[in-house]
Design a protein with these regions (language model features):
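Alpha-helical transmembrane segments of polytopic integral membrane proteins
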Residues: 40-41, 70-74, 78
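Acidic glycine-/aspartate-rich tracts in secreted/extracellular proteins
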Residues: 26, 84-87
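Residue-level hotspots within pore-lining transmembrane alpha-helices
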Residues: 27, 65-68
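Extracellular glycan-interaction patches encoded by glycine-rich segments
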Residues: 33-34, 66
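Transmembrane alpha-helix interface/packing and boundary motifs in multi-pass membrane proteins
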Residues: 24-33
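Membrane-interface segments at transmembrane helix junctions and kinks
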Residues: 6-19, 38-65, 87-171
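Alpha-helical multi-pass transmembrane bundles of energy-transducing inner-membrane proteins
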Residues: 1-4
Length: 171
């Protein structure tokens, strides 16, 4: 079935897929300490540190898109895995977990989502790192400030993402 409105309550039949989807959703929405947190927040923080109109515009757009991403991702989890099963064509009893050939790639991706952000953050962000492998891939018109962004910039997006979870449940 491709209509998520006809799904629901399948987490008991697909427990591994459910856990892997939760991990992927947490990473995609930028949950702290997962891979999406480091990349998304680094972009927003660096945009703020530009200190100009384009940078502030990028911050607003980045935070807004993080909010939308969180809402649609958690809506997918709630509609697909929780709630009532509404499909009259396919009986829930016939549903089963995916074979290992499909689960193994998902497990590898979930491991990367959990650990890659932490282990490779210095490579991508460059804090106290002498390895500037990615430095030429990011072009700036002028050097960034060495200041740190204010705390509200650091904490605002994760707070918005967490607050969007109950909101997306009711969509």
């Amino acid at each position: 079935e491709q209509d998520i409105n006809q799904m629901g309550g399948v987490w008991k039949k697909l427990p591994y897929t459910w856990v892997l989807m939760i991990i992927g959703t947490l990473a995609l929405t930028g949950f702290p300490l997962l891979s999406g947190f480091y990349s998304k927040d680094a972009i927003i923080e660096y945009a703020y540190l530009r200190g100009n109109t384009a940078g502030y515009y990028a911050v607003v757009v980045g935070i807004f898109t993080a909010l939308l991403t969180s809402i649609y991702s958690w809506r997918l989890i709630f509609k697909t895995f929780h709630g009532d099963y509404n499909n009259n064509k396919l009986k829930i009893d016939t549903m089963h977990e995916s074979p290992l050939v499909m689960l193994i790639p998902l497990i590898v991706l979930a491991i990367g989502a959990v650990f890659a952000g932490y282990f490779f953050k210095e490579l991508f962000i460059g804090h106290s790192s002498s390895n500037n492998f990615w430095i030429d891939s990011i072009k700036f018109l002028s050097p960034l400030s060495l200041d740190h962004p204010p705390l509200w910039i650091i904490y605002f997006t994760p707070v918005i993402v967490v607050l969007s979870i109950p909101f997306s449940h009711y969509l």
